[in-house]
C-alpha cells in the first residue's frame, strides 16, 4: 500500500538534496580559485555552506503545513 506523500514534500526533498551536493562542492572550487589554492579556507567555507543548506531544510520542514483535514462528522459516526 503506497503512502500518500504530498508532491510538495518530494519536490522540497529533491531540491535540498541537490543543493546539499552542489552548493558545497561549487563553493569549495570557487574558494580554491579566489584564495589561491588554500584548502583550509575552501573547506571551511564549504562546510559553512553545507550547514546553511541544512538549516534551510530544517526551517522549511518546520514551516510546512502538515495539518490534515478531518473528515466531517456524520450522524452515523457520532
Curated annotation (Swiss-Prot):
It holds the Pfam family VMA21. It is a multi-pass membrane protein. Its main location: endoplasmic reticulum. The chain crosses the membrane at residues 15-35, 39-59. One of its GO terms (cellular component) is endoplasmic reticulum-Golgi intermediate compartment membrane. Residues 1-14, 60-78 are cytoplasmic. A motif (Prevents secretion from ER) lies at residues 75-78. One of its GO terms (biological process) is vacuolar proton-transporting V-type ATPase complex assembly. It is found in: Endoplasmic reticulum membrane; Endoplasmic reticulum-Golgi intermediate compartment membrane; Cytoplasmic vesicle, COPII-coated vesicle membrane. Residues 36-38 are lumenal. Keywords: Cytoplasmic vesicle, Endoplasmic reticulum, Membrane, Transmembrane, Transmembrane helix. Belongs to the VMA21 family. Required for the assembly of the V0 complex of the vacuolar ATPase (V-ATPase) in the endoplasmic reticulum. This is Vacuolar ATPase assembly integral membrane protein VMA21. It comes from Debaryomyces hansenii (strain ATCC 36239 / CBS 767 / BCRC 21394 / JCM 1990 / NBRC 0083 / IGC 2968) (Yeast). The gene is VMA21.
